[in-house]
């Protein structure tokens, strides 16, 4: 059972699917009716007018109506569009159990506890017939889907079939209108001839709760309190019991026929739903709930959906998956339909059956994997119990008869999933979740240990994607190692792009798009289920949800392309066509409009010519496109779309387009717009527009200041006059101050009653007459004449030397692609004649309109033009002012003959060649060659890509020492700087362009340094030894070697350094640990034991084993100590050491037990985690350092390696490159 939707509510007593929309009505025990959208999983509406439980509910097949019946004895007819009850039908005298519309006539059928069944005309709103005969509650009554029959079930233990053909004839006869007018007078409580009992079905031992007709066959199913489901057959004369389905252990609430298969569904108060096979009369499936009794079942009239109501709500479910199994390769689609494997050619649309499949499985094919090389398919089938899942291996016949295809012999085996991993190998995930590799004979060739997973997917030749609960892992089957992983829970489908460069991981409600290395490029969350997907040729992922076709671009943009009525499964996308399969496995082609995602893709890829073409020709409209362009930083493109002036204004300001902003501001004429435009124009130095903005907003103070700084004194005087007219004393005085007009300032101060200030201003500035006249106005008794400052200095605004008439000069920047197109559209369009070239006639132009072309399609340059037209000799014409004599200074006179040509007068320097260091970089991909050339940046990049170096601090000294060896210096001439020589290691055949630098560091040097490290280890100077080992390890990537043997020796040198660094670092750490508690002592012993598994020299291994032996003997772990003693004796130590060891061994063998359990298993191979110093046993996930190969637990991935101190743990790299041989 596949649950599609589930609700939690009061007890559900009635259910009804809408025939066309994804809606379901639920009637609840608390009197509420709910309308749900089961595809979107949302509650659309609630209807609450009944008093008490509502048991009957039904949608009308054509009208926007539904009917309900409740325990308040009322039948209500509702209009869900108007969201209200239209009317109520009254007549029943007890609870109403079911209500159903007739499929054709305007009738409603109701069953009630008043022991009657009534037929109502919902158009005339009257009862047209009462069916009496049952002598207990009538629990259910339903119309026959095509005949004039009614079936009813009652607690009187009978099922009755009623013939209502008389009612139909009466209501469709000419006198039917009169009978409606008479009302219900022709009906009495004891029934009439309108409806007669045709059959009474007796066989149940207790009350019958439900009865229903088969959609097409003369069958009836019933469920009763005797816990049985009975099947009845009927004909014109009689009805009889066919069979009984036993299995429920409580009252059967409801039973229905499957609309399209030979199945019966029933549910019961025993908290189960059961599926029965009609032909075998046996139970096929059982679905149980823990606490909820089931009360009602409903089947969708058109889709394979069912709904069941229970104590805590309801569920919408399917019995089996409807997703078709298919595989696409090139232009071919292979898919399974009706037990046939079919092949569809996308190009020719030829659809043929190529093979008949082996029967035997009752479950549909779950998935398919196609092998084009061998023309073979793997078909996986999932059982409800996963352990019973199987797969079939078929080879498709080459010359199959498409009319009557054969059923070739297939090879069937158990397994959850099978996918191809090579031309003649496939991988099987078995029921134990281990991976088997099989050949075409279905024989196991090898078993592969993989991390814990529950599903596998194809990931290219030799690779698989492994799914666990939280992530997807890319696994190399050949090398048996994990390459990458990405976090996404419960991936259902994996879709690779055609070139395998991108992959889409589809979960139930999420999509993650990754690159080949499984690095997540974008995450998309959907509220509705994701169904399928395919990659477009342009690299856009087209996917479907339950009700949409959508697109996703790898940058994270996604959107809706079109809506869907029913779910589809995309198989291929090409151009405007989406090829898909529907749930009936029918191939379909849907047309989509790709403009929106192609527009966004063109923007992302900076294909601006395509963008502009779409802007001008495509119908891209809507606020979302404008918002998208603004968000992505393309306001100038958004300007193309916008007609609304307010939006145009804000976009124009955003992209700094003052001209368009000015047009929009004039159209809007809003104060805020003018203010904003003024601010932006001021930033651009466009003072002419700033002036207009200040004038429009009447911002006189700013306008005056603008005139002052631009030196426009004429307009500043006008501003002074305006201020005087406006009686703005402050503004008037300020403008006078800007102009340096002293007499005007005196007049202003005098007019506003500031006599003292007016006098001081006049006297200080030498306006004596004015000062005297003001002095006379002072009253000596009441007013004092202010004193004049003898040291006063004249403050006068500087006179403008060059008034600024033009706008501030702006740098000439190249206009953006779109700004240029806007400008050309505006200016060029105004100058160009608005003529359609196709409408120009040829008569008036005559033959001159036709160009005479030569064979190559070029115009003969001189044809049709005489000498007069071209000018004889083709010298410069008089239109060019090139012949005017210029007066040049005499010192520029050039002696005759000096201008005789480049070879006589001027030295042309030779072109600069490529430097030797650049040649080195060009010729080599070895890091050391780039360091010797001084190109540290490229050397770092090579080290990063080859061995994963991310911290270059420790390399600084090595880089500088190596660079110093890359050149020689010599003195050429006295008093001149030294010159450099660049020695080549391939000097015999280097030539000018093939040189590579001589290298100072040799492999033998490092091997000699290794001996010193061994000596330091022997004398116990561990920390110093670790530093020396690390120095050798970091030097290895800077080697250059000539043959494969030396490459192997260098790699062996890395292994030696790693083993010693990990072991000695662990030993140093062990010695620092405290020894107070038992747990601390156990940890010390564990670390000593791990050290014995390092690959060291025998002399050092003896010392390590002696240490471990002593520690374990003291801890009384005699069994492990004995093992160490035996290993020590095998190495042949000194006689005194051997004697001591044998004594300890004999003591241990007397009591060969371990006193304490340690995290150490000597028999299980393991690697030591170089960070935590704990074992990583074989088969556990492990991350490695790309340079040293040191092992780490997965939690350390992405951190810096403790061994090298420079590399990133778990980084995916090319590998160590120290020889030109490795690049061939």
From Swiss-Prot:
Q: What is annotated about its quaternary structure and interactions?
A: Oligomeric complex that consists of at least the alpha, beta, beta', gamma, delta, epsilon and zeta subunits. Interacts with SCYL1. Interacts with JAGN1. Interacts with TMEM41B. Interacts with SVEP1. Probably interacts with PEX11A.
**General function of this protein:** The coatomer is a cytosolic protein complex that binds to dilysine motifs and reversibly associates with Golgi non-clathrin-coated vesicles, which further mediate biosynthetic protein transport from the ER, via the Golgi up to the trans Golgi network. Coatomer complex is required for budding from Golgi membranes, and is essential for the retrograde Golgi-to-ER transport of dilysine-tagged proteins. Xenin stimulates exocrine pancreatic secretion. It inhibits pentagastrin-stimulated secretion of acid, to induce exocrine pancreatic secretion and to affect small and large intestinal motility. In the gut, xenin interacts with the neurotensin receptor.
Pfam families assigned:
B-prop_COPA_B_2nd, COPI_C, TPR_COPA_B, WD40
Membrane topology reported for the UniProt record:
Peripheral membrane protein
Upper lineage: Eukaryota, Metazoa, Chordata, Craniata, Vertebrata
Which regions are annotated as WD repeats?
7-37, 49-79, 91-121, 133-163, 203-233, 247-277
Q: Where in the cell is it found?
A: Cytoplasm; Golgi apparatus membrane; Cytoplasmic vesicle, COPI-coated vesicle membrane
Q: What is this protein called?
A: Coatomer subunit alpha
Q: Name one GO cellular component term.
A: COPI vesicle coat
UniProt-listed InterPro entries: Beta-prop_COPA/B_2nd, Coatomer_alpha_WD-assoc_reg, Coatomer_asu, Coatomer_asu_C, Coatomer_complex_subunit, G-protein_beta_WD-40_rep, TPR_COPA_B, WD40/YVTN_repeat-like_dom_sf
Q: Positions modified as Omega-N-methylarginine?
A: 965
Per the UniProt entry, what are the Gene Ontology biological process annotations, in alphabetical order?
Answer: endoplasmic reticulum to Golgi vesicle-mediated transport; intra-Golgi vesicle-mediated transport; intracellular protein transport; retrograde vesicle-mediated transport, Golgi to endoplasmic reticulum
The PTM Phosphoserine maps to 173, 1193
Instruction: Spell out the molecular function terms from Gene Ontology.
Output: hormone activity; structural molecule activity
